[in-house]
């Protein structure tokens, strides 16, 4: 087979090599014995379990007061305008709402475990509500 002369061709694209940040380059070029220490990371699920224990111990309200109050007033306007609420009424409604949501998530979690999963999906919430008799 005869040799042919190669001609220069225009490149048709492709990705250009990415430039690394100075910190990444320094981290890679640092010797193994000393240099930049990797930040500590907990194993997946450890922080989630810690948060579960923390929130199960606590009794404080988890939804911020002002956003809840704005939402409550917005919903109440659909029924009657210029309604006024005592602060104790707002607190009672928030307590009831959070209690309902916590119970719903507990039931939803049972549905998730029954399905041999660990991730909550909308269908789990729908099933929990259907079993409770809230949604036909």
Curated annotation (Swiss-Prot):
PTM statement from Swiss-Prot or TrEMBL: Acetylation is generally linked to gene activation. Acetylation on Lys-10 (H3K9ac) impairs methylation at Arg-9 (H3R8me2s). Acetylation on Lys-19 (H3K18ac) and Lys-24 (H3K24ac) favors methylation at Arg-18 (H3R17me). Acetylation at Lys-123 (H3K122ac) by EP300/p300 plays a central role in chromatin structure: localizes at the surface of the histone octamer and stimulates transcription, possibly by promoting nucleosome instability.
Positions bearing N6,N6-dimethyllysine: 5, 10, 28, 37, 80
UniProt keyword list: Acetylation, ADP-ribosylation, Chromosome, Citrullination, DNA-binding, Hydroxylation, Methylation, Nucleosome core, Nucleus, Phosphoprotein, Ubl conjugation
Modified residues (5-glutamyl dopamine): 6
Modified residues (N6-(2-hydroxyisobutyryl)lysine): 5, 10, 15, 19, 24, 28, 37, 57, 65, 80, 123
Modification Phosphoserine occurs at: 11, 29, 58, 87
Pfam family, one: Histone
Tissue-level expression: Expressed in testicular cells.
PTM-bearing positions, type N6-butyryllysine: 19, 24
Modified residues (N6-methyllysine): 5, 10, 19, 24, 28, 37-38, 57, 65, 80, 123
Gene Ontology BP annotations: chromatin organization; DNA replication-dependent chromatin assembly; nucleosome assembly; regulation of cell differentiation; spermatogonial cell division
GO MF entries: DNA binding; protein heterodimerization activity; structural constituent of chromatin
Modification sites for Phosphothreonine: 4, 7, 12, 81, 108
N6-succinyllysine PTM positions: 15, 57, 80, 123
Asymmetric dimethylarginine PTM positions: 3, 18
Modified residues (Allysine): 5
Keyword Nucleotide-binding: no
Residues modified as Phosphotyrosine: 42
5-glutamyl serotonin, modified sites: 6
Superkingdom, taxonomy of origin: Eukaryota
Residue(s) carrying Citrulline: 3, 9, 18, 27
Modified residues (N6-acetyllysine): 5, 10, 15, 19, 24, 28, 37, 57, 80, 116, 123
Region named Disordered: 1-43
Assembly and binders: The nucleosome is a histone octamer containing two molecules each of H2A, H2B, H3 and H4 assembled in one H3-H4 heterotetramer and two H2A-H2B heterodimers. The octamer wraps approximately 147 bp of DNA. Interacts with TONSL; CHAF1A and CHAF1B.
Sequence similarity: Belongs to the histone H3 family.
Protein name: Histone H3.1t
Species whose genome carries this gene: Homo sapiens (Human)
Gene from which the chain derives: H3-4
């Amino acid at each position: 087979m005869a040799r042919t002369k190669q001609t220069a061709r225009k490149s048709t694209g492709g990705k250009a090599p990415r430039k690394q940040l100075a910190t990444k380059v320094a981290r890679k070029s640092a010797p193994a014995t000393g240099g930049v220490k990797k930040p500590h990371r907990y194993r997946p699920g450890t922080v989630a379990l810690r948060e579960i224990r923390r929130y199960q111990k606590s009794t404080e309200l988890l939804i911020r007061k002002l956003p809840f109050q704005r939402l409550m007033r917005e919903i109440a306007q659909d029924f009657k305008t210029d309604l006024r609420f005592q602060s104790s009424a707002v607190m009672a409604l928030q307590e009831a709402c959070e209690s309902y949501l916590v119970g719903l998530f507990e039931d939803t979690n049972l549905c998730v475990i029954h399905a041999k999963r660990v991730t909550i999906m909308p269908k789990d919430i729908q099933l929990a509500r259907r079993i409770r008799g809230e949604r036909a």
